[in-house]
């Protein structure tokens, strides 16, 4: 559902995404998505679904949205699952986090896109301010987006972070992505670390009985 709300645009130009230098003014599209998700939650509750049985989940930008929603409204649902939260491009890869470290990499990002960097940090700070964020957060160190910029999750009360693996296997099982008439080792995909939750090996975290 998070991705079905792509028609929602923030108050600033939707074409800018994070590539703006001025401080973000108005309501960001992620905040608008939160409101739409909360509206959907209330519809389910009105149909008789217990709040504690409703779990919000999202991948990438949807993963960040999940964290933001649960930080602001921890009692509205039973909890959340965030997969590879990221909404500001391939920061780990582009700014060479592994080589220069998070601090220097984020400083370079802030120099190039001060508005985007400020908004990202503001969102993180708001999440960290919450007294309880009941979210299971999956990250991968080889995620080109924020794989090496996710340690802040360890500071968020209520968040349980799972670092999936150090390579493209889970529990020694090779990870394969499958479609209707194709399958491919995830290591051959673009941004494989960002897609680990879409591979068959990820079933390890939700074993079939």
PLM regions and their residue ranges:
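Solvent-exposed, acidic/flexible segments
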Residues: 27-34, 59, 63, 116, ...
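Alpha/beta-hydrolase active-site loop
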Residues: 21-48
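Cap/lid segment of the alpha/beta-hydrolase catalytic domain
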Residues: 4-31
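Solvent-exposed loop/turn segments at secondary-structure junctions
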Residues: 7-11, 60-64, 86-89, 141-145, ...
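The feature captures the conserved acid-bearing segment of alpha/beta-hydrolase catalytic domains
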Residues: 87-164
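C-terminal catalytic histidine-bearing segment of alpha/beta-hydrolase fold enzymes
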Residues: 157-209
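Primarily recognizes the serine-hydrolase "nucleophile elbow" in alpha/beta-hydrolase
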Residues: 43, 47, 52-100
């Amino acid at each position: 559902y998070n991705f079905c709300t792509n028609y929602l645009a923030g108050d600033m130009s939707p074409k800018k995404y994070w590539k703006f230098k001025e401080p973000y003014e108005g309501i960001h599209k992620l905040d608008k998505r939160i409101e739409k998700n909360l509206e959907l939650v209330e519809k389910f509750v009105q149909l008789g679904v217990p709040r504690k049985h409703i779990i919000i989940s999202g991948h990438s930008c949807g993963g960040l949205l999940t964290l933001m929603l649960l930080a602001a409204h921890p009692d509205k649902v039973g909890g959340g699952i965030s997969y590879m939260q990221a909404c500001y491009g391939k920061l780990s890869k582009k700014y060479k986090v592994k080589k220069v470290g998070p601090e220097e990499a984020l400083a370079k990002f802030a120099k190039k896109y001060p508005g985007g960097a400020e908004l990202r940090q503001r969102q993180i700070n708001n999440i960290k301010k919450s007294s309880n964020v009941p979210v299971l957060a999956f990250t991968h160190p080889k995620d080109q987006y924020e794989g090496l910029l996710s340690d802040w999750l360890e500071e968020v009360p209520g968040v349980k972070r799972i670092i999936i693996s150090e390579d493209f296997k889970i529990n020694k099982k090779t990870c394969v992505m499958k479609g209707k008439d194709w399958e491919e080792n995830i290591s051959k995909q673009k941004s494989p670390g960002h897609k680990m939750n879409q591979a068959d090996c990820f079933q390890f975290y939700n074993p079939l009985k």
